[in-house]
Amino acid sequence: MTLKTPHPTRRTRSTRKAWVAASVCLALLHGAAQAADTSSAKQLERFSAQAGTPGQAERGRAFFTSRQGGEWSCSSCHGNPPTKAGKHASTGKLIDPMAPAANPSTFTDTAKVDKWFRRNCKDVLQRECSAGEKADVLAYLIGLKP
């Protein structure tokens, strides 16, 4: 004996569509919430606490715009001032503005902040940046206005 399943009615189809739409929205909201787990101010607090001293914008500006013994400075790719899109020095790839006032989503994902500081500091300095250097750069970037 075979059981026939009834053909879905319009109501069950619309209910199913509503559940799918709700699930997709929740997944997107969850992803957005995870991506924005912090703020640039919280990142500055974190690095200042690790360094044991508050970040200083003037030191950050000097660090950001100076070559650190190599060919590049931070501003080689991120621009000077970094309130507009930059361009990677070797690949030519466009880079979003670094200043939080010009790009509110910058420095809002802790994992990405750590990843990009690690990668970019190794490119510019051939080592990781210290917590104090990160705090200084963030203090400088947070103080910039578009």
Predicted regions: what is each one?
Residues A36-Q68:
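Electrostatic cytochrome c docking/interface patches
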Residues D114-P146:
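C-terminal capping alpha-helices of c-type cytochrome domains
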Residues M1-T15:
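N-terminal secretory signal peptides that target proteins for export/translocation
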